[in-house]
């Protein structure tokens, strides 16, 4: 049963997450899939105007290094993920309408941005819910099969590293592309205070790859190249000129820019972890349960 807006306004964020997950599950079981795809694409100029006005109020500017190569036909826009407003600024400059793939909406459930996303077309999911991830994937596939387009952040979390252009990617975008024969448009974005720089890449055709592993690797390499081109254009600092406490400064700046419901801990949990990372963590986890003795003391020595 749908709760009234007033009732939802009194709910906590965890309660809202549980409520909306239950709604998504019910709609999926009832066979409800993305609707009014074409109508929402036609309404894109209205959304774009709203985003432009909002950006001007934030006193932000956007520079396009290379424009988007695809204006018609379905596509998956795979974007690097940085700070707040990256999605909005990319979408404003995209030049066409598409649905958004958004994980862990949290505050968006009771914020005007959530209503905006819903009107535009969005697929929400809780990233720690396996069933919700499956439903979001299937709804995305259906959207693409119906001719719609999708904007997604395959890193799965904001990039909080000091020197990685792109973190390891989830394979979902590649699997969607292969299953629906949809080209992927890689997008790199970087922020310099109030100025954003966006770099659109050429389309990657899934038919050119044998499997999603190869496609994901190529996608990440291409996204990293797009970010590197931005850094090169902006004349980033050389390593020798960086302050000795640069890492600390970066972490402090990063934590200031992420939304209040994101923390370095939650970002670490939601990003993609490679098999090597998982195996390493599994090896080290048992150390917390070991009782030091002369037979195992070597495991606790700092190297």
Language-model features: where?
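Catalytic core of membrane glycerolipid acyltransferases/transacylases, capturing the structured
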Residues: 71-130
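A short, surface-exposed helix-loop junction/capping segment
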Residues: 23-35
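Short hydrophobic helices that act as membrane-entry/anchoring signals
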Residues: 7, 11, 36, 40-58, ...
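Soluble or luminal CAZymes and related metallo-dependent hydrolases
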Residues: 41-45, 132, 215
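Non-catalytic C-terminal accessory region of glycerolipid acyltransferases
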Residues: 2-23, 134-303
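Short acidic-hydrophobic, aromatic-tinged amphipathic segments that line or gate anion-handling sites
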Residues: 62-64, 123-127, 206
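Helix-to-loop junction immediately C-terminal to a conserved catalytic motif
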Residues: 47-81
């Amino acid at each position: 049963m749908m709760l009234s807006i007033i009732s939802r306004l009194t709910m906590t964020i965890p309660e809202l997450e549980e409520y909306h997950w239950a709604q998504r599950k019910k709609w999926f079981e009832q066979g409800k899939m993305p609707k009014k795809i074409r109508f929402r694409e036609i309404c894109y100029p209205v959304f774009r105007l709203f985003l432009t006005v909002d950006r001007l109020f934030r006193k932000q500017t956007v520079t396009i290094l290379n424009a988007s190569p695809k204006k018609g036909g379905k596509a998956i826009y795979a974007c690097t993920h940085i700070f707040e407003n990256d999605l909005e600024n990319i979408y404003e400059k995209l030049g066409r309408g598409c649905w958004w793939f958004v994980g862990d909406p949290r505050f968006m459930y009771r914020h005007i941005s959530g209503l905006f996303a819903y009107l535009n077309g969005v697929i929400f999911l809780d990233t720690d819910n396996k069933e919700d991830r499956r439903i979001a994937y299937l709804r995305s596939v259906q959207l693409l099969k119906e001719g719609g387009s999708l904007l997604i952040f395959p890193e799965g979390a904001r990039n909080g590293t000091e020197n990685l252009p792109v973190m390891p990617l989830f394979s979902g975008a590649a699997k969607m592309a292969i299953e629906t024969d949809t080209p992927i448009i890689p997008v790199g974005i970087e922020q310099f205070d109030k100025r954003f720089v966006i770099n659109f890449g050429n389309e990657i055709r899934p038919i050119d790859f044998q499997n999603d592993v190869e496609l994901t690797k190529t996608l990440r390499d291409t996204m990293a190249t797009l970010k590197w081109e931005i850094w090169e254009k902006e004349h980033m600092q050389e390593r020798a000129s960086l302050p000795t406490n640069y890492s600390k400064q970066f972490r402090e700046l990063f934590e200031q820019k992420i939304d209040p419901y994101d923390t370095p801990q939650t970002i670490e949990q939601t990003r993609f972890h490679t098999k090597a990372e998982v195996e390493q963590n599994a090896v080290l986890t048992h150390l917390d349960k070991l009782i030091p003795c002369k037979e195992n003391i070597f495991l606790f020595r700092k190297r």
